[in-house]
C-alpha cells in the first residue's frame, strides 16, 4: 500500500510523513523527490521542460511508480510518500501506473489556508520566504479548486500540529 501525502509547500508533508511512518507498522518513507533529483543530476541536462520542475520530464512519473513497486516487492509493508503533485495528468499517470501493479493508494492532501501557508514558509528555518515554495501557492489553490480535493482525502492542517495530522491519517489508513 501507498499512503500519498500531497499538498503544497508549507502544508507539512515532510514532517507529517515521518510521524505517519511511526504510526503505521511495517512502513517506510519514500521521498519521490529523490527520483527527480537523480534526473536533475544527469549531465548534460535532459531536454525539454523540467529544468525548473523535474515533474515535467516524462521519465519522472514512471520511475516513481517503478521505484515504489520494486521497493514494495522487496520489502513489503506500506510506503508513505510525501510529494506534491499539482498537475492532474501527472497524478493520473502515477495513480494508473500503481493501479496496473495492483498497489492500493490512499491519497491525502494536507491543506491549509493561504495565510497559514505563507506564515509557515516565512518561518521555515531552512529557507524562510523561499521564492520556490511561494510560487506554488497559487497553482496549489487552482489544483485544489479544480481536481485535487475531489481526488483525495483532505486533511485541513490549518489548526493541527503535524502529530495531530499524522494521527488522523494513520487512523484513517488503519480503518
Predicted regions and their residues:
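Conserved phosphate-donor/acceptor-positioning beta-strand/loop module used by diverse small-molecule
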Residues: 99-121, 155
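Walker A (P-loop) ATP-phosphate-binding motif of ABC ATPase nucleotide-binding domains
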Residues: 2
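The conserved Walker
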Residues: 9
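Hydrophobic anchor at the beta1->P-loop junction of P-loop NTPases
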Residues: 5
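Glycine-rich phosphate-binding loop used to anchor ATP phosphates in small-molecule kinases
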Residues: 56-105
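Conserved substrate/cofactor phosphate-moiety recognition/catalytic segment
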Residues: 18-65
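Walker A/P-loop
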Residues: 14
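Small-molecule kinase domains that catalyze NTP-dependent phosphoryl transfer to phosphate-bearing small molecules
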Residues: 123-168
Amino acid at each position: 500500500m501507498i499512503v500519498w501525502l500531497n499538498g503544497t509547500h508549507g502544508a507539512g508533508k515532510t514532517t507529517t510523513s515521518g510521524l505517519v511512518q511511526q504510526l503505521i507498522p511495517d512502513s517506510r518513507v519514500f521521498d519521490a523527490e529523490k527520483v527527480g533529483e537523480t534526473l536533475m543530476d544527469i549531465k548534460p541536462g535532459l531536454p525539454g521542460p523540467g529544468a525548473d520542475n523535474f515533474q515535467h520530464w516524462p521519465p519522472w512519473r514512471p520511475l516513481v511508480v517503478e521505484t515504489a513497486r520494486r521497493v514494495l516487492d522487496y520489502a513489503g509493508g506500506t510506503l508513505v510518500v510525501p510529494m506534491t503533485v499539482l498537475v492532474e495528468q501527472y497524478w493520473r499517470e502515477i495513480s494508473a501506473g500503481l493501479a496496473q501493479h495492483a498497489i492500493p493508494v490512499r491519497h491525502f492532501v494536507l491543506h491549509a489556508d493561504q495565510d497559514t501557508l505563507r506564515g509557515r514558509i516565512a518561518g521555515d528555518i531552512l529557507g524562510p520566504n523561499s521564492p520556490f515554495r511561494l510560487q506554488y501557492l497559487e497553482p496549489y489553490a487552482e489544483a485544489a479548486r479544480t481536481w485535487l480535493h475531489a481526488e483525495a482525502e483532505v486533511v485541513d492542517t490549518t489548526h493541527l500540529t503535524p502529530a495531530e495530522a499524522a494521527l488522523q491519517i494513520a487512523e484513517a489508513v488503519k480503518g
